[in-house]
Amino acid sequence: MTHAHITSWLITIVLFFLAVSMERQGAGKAKIVQMVLRLFYILTIVTGLLLLHSIASISALYWLKALAGLWVIGAMEMVLAAEKKGKSAAARWTQWVIALAVTLFLGLLLPLGFDLF
C-alpha cells in the first residue's frame, strides 16, 4: 500500500503543476486537469487512510502527518483558486511549500517512511 500512496501523491503533484501551468495560460482543458487532480486527491487520501489503518499502534506523529497531508491538499486548492481569479498566489505558494516540507519530513521520519533521518 505504501507504493500506491507514494505513486498517488507523486501523480497529484505533477497534475497540480500541470493544472497551474494550464490555468496561467488560460487553456480550456485546465478544468479537466483539475477534475483529474481532485480524483487523485481522493486516491491519495484513501491510500493514506489505508496505511493508517494498517499500523498496529498509531502514534500522534502519524495523525500529525495525516493532518499535514490534508493541509497540502488544501493549499493546492488555494493556489489553484488564486490563479483562477488572477490574484497573487505568493502567500499560498509559500504555505504549500511549508506544508509539503512538513509532510515529507514526517513521512520520512516515521517508521513506514524511508530511512533518511
UniProtKB/Swiss-Prot annotation:
Membrane topology: Multi-pass membrane protein
Domain of life: Bacteria
Coiled coil: none
GO cellular component: plasma membrane
InterPro entries per the UniProt record, alphabetical: UPF0344
Membrane-spanning residues: 1-21, 39-59, 60-80, 97-117
Protein name, per record: UPF0344 protein GK0697
Organism expressing this protein natively: Geobacillus kaustophilus (strain HTA426)
